[in-house]
C-alpha cells in the first residue's frame, strides 16, 4: 500500500510542516502550513503555527486574516490575539484595541493585559482610565517595578516630564531597578525640563565612564544643553512595544524561544528603532541555528 500522504489529503504537507516547525525552519513550515490552511480552514493548530512562523520571519500582513478567522470561530488564541493587537496599534485604531482587550482577548496575563489596556486607553484619548487601570495593577507582585515604569512612560509620552521623573527617581531608589532603556528615558525627561545638570549626575551614577557611542552622543547633548533629535519612547506604539519587549525578555530566560521571538518581533515592528528587541530576536534566532533570518 502507498502511504496515505502519497494518495491524497493533507497528511503529507501537515507532517512536513510539523517537522519544519520542530526544526525551526520557518520558511519551509510557512509554505506547507499555507497549503494545509488553504484546504482545511478548521485546522486551528495549523493556523496558529502559521502565525508563529510568519511572525518569526517578520511577516505580519499575511497573518491578520488568519487571526481574524481564529477569533471569529470563538477560539481563545493568544497567538491570534497578539496578531490583532499588532494590527490595531499599527493603524492606530486604539478604540478597537480597547474593545478587544476589554473582551479578554489579550495575552492572558493580568498585569500584561492591564498594561496593554492602559496604553490602548491613552491612544484612545482616555488617560484618566489608563491611570485608573494602573492603580489597579500597582500592588501586583512581582510586577510593581514594571507597572511603575509604564506609568512613568505614559507621563513621558504625554509630555508630563516632571511626573515621569518623580516616578523614575522613586524606582531608582531600588538597586538595579532601572534598565538601561529606563535610564535613557529618564535622562530625556530631565533634559526636556532643562535639568541638564541633574541629567549629567544621573548619567554618571548609572554608567560612570563606561559609555558606548549612544551614551557618548547623549553626554554631548547634555553638556551642550540640547535635546536629542528624538525620544527613545515617544508614542503609544513605543509604549506598547515596551510591553512586548518585557514579555520577550521574560520568555527568553525561560527558553521559550518561539514565543520569545514572536514578542520580540512585535516590539521590533511597533518601535522600529528598538535596538534591544532587534538584538534579542537575533539572539533567539542564533540559538535556533537560523542565522540567515
Q: Where in this protein do the model-derived segments appear?
A:
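N-terminal leader/linker segments that initiate helical-solenoid repeat arrays
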Residues: 1-68, 72-79, 83, 91-94, ...
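Short, intrinsically disordered, charge-balanced linker/junction segments flanking boundaries
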Residues: 2, 168, 267, 281-293
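Generic helix N-cap/helix-start motif at coil->alpha-helix transitions
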Residues: 5-13, 40-47, 73-82, 106-116, ...
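Conserved small-residue packing positions in alpha-helical repeats and bundles
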Residues: 17, 51, 85-88, 118, ...
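Long, contiguous interaction/recruitment modules in multidomain scaffold/adaptor proteins
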Residues: 35, 181, 185-188, 192-237
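Alpha-helical repeat scaffolds
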Residues: 60-72, 94-106, 127-139, 161-173, ...
Amino acid at each position: 500500500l502507498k502511504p496515505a500522504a502519497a494518495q491524497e489529503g493533507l497528511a503529507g504537507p501537515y507532517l512536513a510542516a510539523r517537522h519544519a516547525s520542530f526544526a525551526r525552519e520557518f520558511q519551509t513550515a510557512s509554505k506547507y502550513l499555507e497549503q494545509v490552511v488553504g484546504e482545511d480552514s478548521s485546522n486551528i493548530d495549523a493556523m496558529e503555527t502559521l502565525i508563529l512562523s510568519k511572525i518569526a520571519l517578520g511577516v505580519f500582513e499575511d497573518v491578520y486574516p488568519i487571526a481574524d478567522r481564529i477569533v471569529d470561530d470563538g477560539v481563545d488564541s493568544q497567538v491570534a490575539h497578539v496578531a490583532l493587537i499588532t494590527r490595531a496599534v499599527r493603524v492606530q485604531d486604539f478604540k478597537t484595541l480597547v474593545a478587544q482587550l476589554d473582551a479578554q482577548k489579550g495575552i492572558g496575563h493580568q498585569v500584561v493585559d492591564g498594561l496593554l489596556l492602559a496604553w490602548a486607553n491613552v491612544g484612545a484619548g482616555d488617560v484618566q482610565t489608563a491611570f485608573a487601570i494602573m492603580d489597579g495593577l500597582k500592588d501586583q507582585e512581582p510586577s510593581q517595578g514594571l507597572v511603575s515604569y509604564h506609568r512613568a512612560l505614559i507621563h513621558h509620552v504625554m509630555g508630563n516630564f516632571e511626573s515621569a521623573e518623580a516616578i523614575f527617581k522613586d524606582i531608582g531608589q531600588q538597586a538595579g531597578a532601572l534598565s538601561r532603556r529606563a535610564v535613557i528615558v529618564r535622562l530625556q525627561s530631565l533634559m526636556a525640563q532643562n535639568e541638564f545638570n541633574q541629567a549629567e549626575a544621573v548619567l554618571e551614577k548609572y554608567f560612570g565612564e563606561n559609555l558606548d557611542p549612544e551614551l557618548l552622543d547623549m553626554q554631548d547633548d547634555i553638556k551642550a544643553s540640547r535635546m536629542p533629535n528624538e525620544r527613545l519612547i515617544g508614542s503609544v506604539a513605543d509604549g506598547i512595544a515596551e510591553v512586548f519587549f518585557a514579555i520577550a525578555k521574560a520568555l527568553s530566560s525561560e527558553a521559550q524561544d518561539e514565543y520569545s521571538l514572536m514578542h520580540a518581533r512585535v516590539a521590533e515592528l511597533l518601535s522600529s528603532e528598538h535596538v534591544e528587541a532587534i538584538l534579542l530576536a537575533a539572539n533567539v534566532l542564533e540559538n535556533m541555528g537560523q542565522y540567515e533570518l
